């Protein structure tokens, strides 16, 4: 049984509250019964909140585990009295770089909003066997889609120069060469195929001294970005979203590190048909950060699709 009666056609809220949820919803300026694309569905927290505000939602996620959450949401919609859940909610397993094709095939040609919550989800971090978390032991995998080369494959096959370049470019790691040399030396002794072994190799290579966070954090970020081509996918998704949006529609993006945020900032600036809604990105308040430490790094940028000028070709 559900706690509290669900309003007709509105499913119950998710137990896990996403980062900066209310600010995301406000920035999307939801118009009831218009379509919004939740391009990073995850466990469905944003989608449930969007449905509760009256939006219709096309949800996309490449993570194979997301489909079970989508099915649970469909079941909740039926319980809440929606005879045909596809009128309110559609889920497509796909990479958000394929947003244009997905939206066309799903019958959502000009959505009123697109939401991207970037990076690795708490759902992925909480499962040690996915290989995303340096604090949880598991196979060194890191694939969001479950297909293609793993992080263990990269760590096994790349030479020191390639590893150092990835750590420097995608992890913004100051000690990239030192860590890369340590990885090459360690793998000659025994395979680096678990998260705990990689984390220990990086920790041992790191210079002594006070640290704000775990020494392996930037290395794991860099490998995850390479494994999933995250920045290439983001650029593709931003272009597709801006092309798709109806005039007056909103594009809202949550980024968690400077590489992502820079790409979003430049995408908004470089498109004549996008108007940024804030001069600087919005950040989570102290209370939210205290309740959810992941919110500390979040930066929210939002833009509105402008109508074409009259007389424009």
Regions picked out by a protein language model, each given a short descriptive name:
Residues 1-313:
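S-adenosyl-L-methionine-dependent methyltransferase catalytic core, i.e., the SAM/SAH-binding region
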């Amino acid at each position: 049984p559900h706690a509290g009666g669900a309003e007709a056609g509105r499913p119950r809220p998710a137990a896990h509250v996403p980062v900066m949820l209310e600010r995301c919803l406000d920035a999307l300026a939801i118009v009831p019964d218009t379509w919004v694309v939740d391009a990073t569905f995850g466990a469905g927290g944003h989608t449930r909140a969007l449905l509760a505000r009256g939006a219709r939602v096309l949800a996309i996620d490449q993570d194979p585990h997301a489909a079970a959450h989508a099915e649970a949401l469909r079941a909740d919609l039926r319980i809440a009295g929606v005879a045909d859940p596809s009128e309110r909610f559609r889920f497509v397993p796909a990479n958000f770089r394929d947003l244009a094709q997905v939206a066309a095939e799903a019958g959502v040609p000009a959505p009123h909003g697109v939401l991207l919550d970037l990076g690795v989800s708490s759902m992925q971090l909480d499962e040690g066997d996915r290989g995303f978390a340096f604090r949880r032991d598991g196979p060194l995998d890191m694939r969001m889609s479950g297909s293609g080369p793993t992080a263990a494959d990269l760590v096994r096959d790349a030479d020191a120069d390639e590893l150092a370049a990835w750590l420097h470019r995608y992890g913004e790691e100051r000690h990239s060469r030192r860590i890369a040399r340590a990885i090459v030396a360690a793998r000659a002794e025994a395979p680096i195929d678990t998260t705990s072994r990689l984390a220990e190799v990086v920790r041992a290579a790191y210079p002594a001294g006070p640290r704000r966070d775990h020494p392996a954090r930037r290395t794991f970020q860099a490998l995850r970005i390479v494994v999933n081509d995250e920045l290439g996918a983001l650029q593709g998704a931003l272009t597709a979203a801006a092309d798709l949006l109806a005039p007056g529609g909103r594009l809202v993006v949550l980024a968690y590190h400077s590489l992502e945020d820079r790409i979003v900032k430049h995408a908004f600036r470089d498109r004549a048909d996008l108007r940024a809604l804030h001069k600087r990105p919005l950040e989570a308040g102290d209370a939210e950060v205290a309740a959810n430490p992941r919110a500390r790094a979040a930066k929210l940028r939002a833009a509105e699709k402008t109508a074409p000028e009259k007389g424009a070709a």
